[in-house]
Amino acid sequence: MQALLKLSRGIDWLNTQVGKYVIWLILGSTFISGVNAVVRKAFNISSNGFLEVQWYLFAASFLLAAGYTLLQGEHVKVDVVSSRFSKRTQIWIDVFGYIVFLTPMCMAVLWYGIPFFTRAFVSGEMSSNAGGLIRWPVYLMMPLGFSLLWLQGVSELIKRLAFLKGLIEDPTAKKAEKTAEEE
């Protein structure tokens, strides 16, 4: 179990690093969005390429941050129901959710997303808009983001099983450490 906990710490570190860089994608998306709006209104000029970069960055930030968001315990849960149960029961509900819902959903996205990306990459698929961009970078974000989410699900599963065995403290307790946004 110690080897699995070490793997869990490695996955947590990876998603924390990704979370730190995704913050910059959000800033870039916001900057490009602002420049697009000003240039379009002030000079009556628009670029499909810049509009597409804007939504590429927006999509990348949400997809790549999914694992980090799970690490921080910020994914939506039905706490109204689970808060009535004991901590062990809540942990078992999490274990059930990771195995029955999160893993199959991530695997389905990977199963269909990887060939989707591969076809776009091999064919050099382009946007149908004049001045549009190649599509494969944004298609790559789907399998990449869901891989990070699934890995974080594995990490959370390991931590919860270790808690149930009495090897670690409650992994769902909020820690006083800084998040990537605060650093």
Predicted segment positions?
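Alpha-helical transmembrane segments and membrane-interface helix-loop junctions
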Residues: M1-E183
